[in-house]
């Protein structure tokens, strides 16, 4: 009987590990439920190639200025946000209380009202953008090609070529930005500032989740399963080494008691940045990570002030 119980427990453990890895190897694609028009903003649909040719889709929201904010999004989300309030998209996040909608439309409204042009796009494998990198998520180590593609696209448009640029890089989008700055710093030469809600190391995410699941010793199994499923190394998706390339004025934001990671991770990312002008804003009073994504839409002051200081 003990052998049967042990076999069942092993099967359950293996299934849980497989489920965690499948979120990266076979990412769900959530729908784009809103558009800038919902907030009265004129916009056009755009598409452009990533650095490796993957087709990236997005919105361009024009303004009468020489300033441009380029925005991307968290993992499993898209340029609109994330429909976590709807099944099946919120199911995986229910246990942590994150089965709520993330809505980035107010971000774009606040930025436009402050005089910024906006280019918002979907990372590969999300939203309307094409599949790339074998259809797997790289937590930034593949998606950096999309970030560079967005910068090259802005420079390719005559009316945007001389724009003062800021980046609104959220979660995986900030990871991708940091990886891009590490690999191709020359592509970021005219970026003046970054606002970055909640970058995250994948090992910190997995380690925290495994702790909640009562499997704190399973991280090596997850790393092995991830390697087998995606040909990527978990250690390569830890962000502090890439943060060492961030010498641009950067504002980080993070839910301090985030149930899906630890404050030590974002603190290590922040500490590794050599930027002379940098700040870390802790979001208090919640343990829901997705409240961190909704913070700037509801409290735009820090974002508008940061871009105002460094972009103009």
List each language-model region with its residue ranges.
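Acidic catalytic loop of the alpha/beta-hydrolase fold
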Residues: 256-261, 288-289
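Short beta-strand/loop motif that positions the catalytic acidic residue
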Residues: 245-247, 252-254, 258
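Short alpha-helix in the alpha/beta-hydrolase fold that links the catalytic acid
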Residues: 248, 262-271
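Hydrolase active-site cap/lid region
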Residues: 179-232, 292
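Alpha/beta-hydrolase active-site loop
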Residues: 103-113, 123, 136-158
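Short, surface-exposed "cap/lid" segments of acyl-processing enzymes
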Residues: 63-114, 118-120
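An N-terminal hydrophobic leader/cap segment in hydrolases
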Residues: 1-49, 56-59, 63
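Catalytic active-site module of serine/aspartate enzymes centered on a nucleophile-bearing elbow/loop
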Residues: 284, 294-312
